[in-house]
Regions:
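ABC ATPase nucleotide-binding domain
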Residues: 4, 24, 60, 303-305
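ABC ATPase nucleotide-binding domains
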Residues: 30, 71-77, 81-225
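The feature captures the beta-strand-to-loop junction immediately N-terminal to the Walker
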Residues: 34-36
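Helix-to-loop junction immediately C-terminal to a conserved catalytic motif
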Residues: 49
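Conserved coupling/switch loops of ABC nucleotide-binding domains, chiefly the family-specific signature
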Residues: 55-58, 208
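Conserved ABC transporter NBD signature motif
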Residues: 57-65
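Non-catalytic connector elements of ABC transporters
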Residues: 236, 247-325
């Protein structure tokens, strides 16, 4: 099974939300659409689901054109940020409703619901209403509903953005086990790069309705195609040195080091970054972030350096990556 988007355009009023968007998602592959609010990632998902109609372009699932196919006939499993559960129905009834609409015997429906509730560890909440559930439990009910659709494609729109950090971390393995790595293509929309890098096989970084770069998490980190991608991927974000001779130089904070033979600098601030320290230092090239081990002794007048092989170079006008020498 494959998902293909070709030259998708979508405008709302005067605003061009998607501009010639092209995307391929293979069988069992998870592609994350990553970008800032308003970049078009959720609109792309709604077009695939059939909840909106593109102005131009093609959407194909397994080679079949979907643009004019109603949403209810597209067989997509969509999980929303807001859970989209019926508040007056309990968990079992929320799951059963979709199965009733699609037909089948009561015995088959019951067996499938019991099975998915057991897998998602929700058997004890089957008769509870959404208001009686925790945020993590409500999201698992939404996942269960998507699984019961037997979809050709999974579409997940910021499914964990309403959960706290620990719950998101706990749910990731379940998401990967149940939806990602199976037979269906998965499109995962998020603004959280850590989530995208943890779950996706490839990440499409979106900007103003276009894909700025698509690649594996490692490719985007090591070979960012532009200053936009360079600063969007990686935490702390890449240092960009002021342009010199039309070239912007980028240095990852992990590649900077304290060096007694380096350039003098002044420490502006220091904070803990996991087990490491993150320093904000000022040197003759500007203000830079530097990450070093937590036990590092910081001198009163530190000096810094970095290997030239770790530099990234970008055109100062276009922001695009320059080829290596």
């Amino acid at each position: 099974m494959t998902l293909q988007l070709r030259a998708i355009n979508k405008r709302f009023g005067e605003r061009q939300v998607l501009n010639e968007l092209c995307l391929d998602v293979a069988n069992g592959e998870c592609v994350a659409l990553l970008g800032a609010s308003g970049c078009g990632k959720s609109t792309a998902l709604r077009l695939i689901a059939g909840l909106d109609h593109p102005d131009q372009g093609s959407i194909r699932i397994n080679g079949a054109e979907m643009v004019d196919v109603p949403a209810e006939r597209r067989r997509v499993g969509m999980v929303f940020q807001s859970y989209a559960l019926f508040p007056h129905l309990n968990v079992w009834e929320n799951l059963e409703l979709g199965l009733r609409i699609r037909g089948g015997s009561a015995g088959t429906r019951d067996e499938r619901i019991r099975s998915v509730l057991e897998v998602l560890q929700l058997s004890g909440q089957a008769r509870q209403r959404p208001s009686q559930l925790s945020g993590g439990q409500r999201q698992r009910v939404a996942l269960a509903r998507a699984l019961l659709r037997d979809p050709l494609v999974y579409l997940l729109d910021e499914p964990m953005s309403n959960l706290d950090a620990q719950l998101r971390e706990d749910l990731r393995p379940q998401l990967r086990r149940l939806m990602i790595g199976g037979e269906q293509p998965v499109v995962y929309v998020t603004h959280d790069q850590q989530e995208a890098m943890a779950l996706a096989d490839r990440i499409a970084v979106m900007r103003e309705g276009c894909i700025e770069q698509i690649g594996t998490p490692r490719e985007l980190y090591l070979q960012p195609a532009s200053t936009y991608v360079a600063q969007f991927i990686g935490r702390p974000q890449m240092n960009l040195l002021p342009a010199k001779d039309g070239v912007i130089t980028g240095i990852r904070p992990d590649d900077l080091r304290l060096d007694p033979d380096g350039s003098p600098c002044t420490i502006l601030s220091r904070e803990w970054f996991g087990a490491n320290q993150m320093l904000l230092v000022r040197c003759d090239r500007g203000d830079l972030r530097l990450v070093c081990p937590g036990e590092t002794e910081i001198e009163a007048e530190p000096r810094i350096s970095w290997p030239s092989a770790c530099e990234h170079h970008f055109d100062a006008v276009s922001g695009l990556r320059l080829p290596s020498d």
